[in-house]
Amino acid sequence: MTEDQLLGPRAHGEPCGSAVLKAVAEDFQVEEVLDIPLSGEGEHLWLWVEKRNLNTEEAAKRIARAAGVPLKLISYAGLKDRQALTRQWFSLHLPGKADPDLAAAEDDSLRLLQRVRHQRKLQRGAHSANGFRLRLTDLHADHAQLDARLERIRAQGVPNYFGLQRFGYEGGNLLGARDFAARAELPVQRNLRSRLLSAGRSYLFNRVLAQRVADGSWAEARVGDLLAFTDSRSFFPAAEAECSDPRLAILDLHPTGPLWGEGGSPAGAEIQALEDAVAASEEPIANWLAQAGMKHERRILRLPIGGLSWHYPGPDILQLEFVLPTGCFATAMVRELVSLAGQTDI
């Protein structure tokens, strides 16, 4: 499946040119932002870990083996890209135990940068944001055009699409979700079940967002929209007055789209009709998500790009730095700048 099929139209026009991302791991750096003061004591050992071309789950397995503890005692806030240089926290539950020797977990792909004790384990979703440093190489684009596009993105944000990674190689996760949905069955294996449910849910969201981008309403509130702040999971309905709320203009408040589940869309009539039509077009997946017990949630349609800065280390290199809310994809911003020719797994 193509990028346009899995995501949708761009909001800021055609790409300014082409580039390569992730020529090496250091070209895609991600650092977790965690606003939790660690006490220095307690039965949980927190580890600040740097990973190179290593996914989060494999890192957790390595740490568990080196520590001699079951994998279930290892916690992390979120999954990070494999093809990247990433820094994130892990925690180990070690009641009544001394700090283990973790040297066996380390090599060129995993380094332990810091160890701190704390009273509580690291919860999923506990981080407040992710910081990114991206290096686009083999750049074929006019710098002035890129600068203008980046200024526009800084002022207006980008559509908050789920990225290609969510759907697997050539959309394999979505194809798997459709297969199980057609049979009204769920995968027995927990990780596979989670991955396929996530792909199906993300695809329905992207289809709604694609329609809002196509009609120009992805960044504006309509009567009946459900609005949410950037870092909040709660939402409230938009009446006429809320549609002109000044917080929409400064990218603090946003319209939302559906993360499908039981109960259908709680939006107002016009928005609900759009969202229900998308669900009806993928009825087996929508029903399957409800069958699996997924609860209906919301996700902001517009992605604000925090702290965006950029420079050109060379004529064919663009370096970007920015911060995104958790669960959002850096490639949603990159695709509004350049096309990543031939890179289908970014």
Curated annotation (Swiss-Prot):
Family named by the database record: Belongs to the pseudouridine synthase TruD family.
Reaction(s) this enzyme catalyzes, per UniProt: uridine(13) in tRNA = pseudouridine(13) in tRNA
Organism: Stutzerimonas stutzeri (strain A1501)
CDD domains: PseudoU_synth_EcTruD
UniProt-listed Enzyme Commission number(s): 5.4.99.27
Entry keyword set: Isomerase, tRNA processing
Protein name: tRNA pseudouridine synthase D
GO molecular function: RNA binding; tRNA pseudouridine(13) synthase activity
Stored PROSITE patterns: TRUD, UPF0024
The protein's enzyme class: isomerase
Record-level GO BP terms: tRNA pseudouridine synthesis
Matches recorded under PANTHER family: TRNA PSEUDOURIDINE SYNTHASE D
GO CC terms: cytosol
Active site: D81 (nucleophile)
